[in-house]
């Protein structure tokens, strides 16, 4: 066994499935994982107070994602994401290193569209290090993003595969994989400042926030209020293809757009179909 940056025991070096670069599980900051935004010197948030301070002081999208990717403020989530990376890997991925850290955003830092999901999956983003990558939810989403011209490739395998987004960036309401896909209220609140700063840094280019599911919708409305945006009251209810105009203090109007989440629960039951998702994504390109 070797030791990671924080002094914890980790698995020996294993080859990254895309690049072949040796990596530990979890991936050490600055240890060579492709696309890792952090370095060994990136400041680490260990409390909710530190999350607020480090989020607010991040100068740009890159610095913010680096700080997000090393956050350790929620002990339950840290234990879970790292235990999966070390001992709970799915059999199909048992010979692969796992990212095992919070999921940074992925996409265009100057995006006009911000896509907000719920949280990483234990064997998806927590394995690959990229939002909505490595599970069936991601497969459904990336195929649609490619069909509608946002994604360079129809699939997303993992960091280093050449995938890129044009005019779009993907974030999440909670950045760590939670047990049972269910973060607690306290964990959502601790993580919220990261989303707040993601919204701030997206202005003035931001035109639309696309929320995948009700949790993302609620988190985005809360973030907008915290930033002093003009948000309708009572709070607009989430629904598929529901649109709500939000106004930033600068006067800029940002469209909030709802979409059913791309989870298997919705796609297998046909609550969300490929044509439905394509229509929502196509509307992002319509002039406003």
Enumerate the predicted regions with their spans.
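A polyanion-binding, active-site-adjacent surface
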Residues: 6, 13-246, 250-287
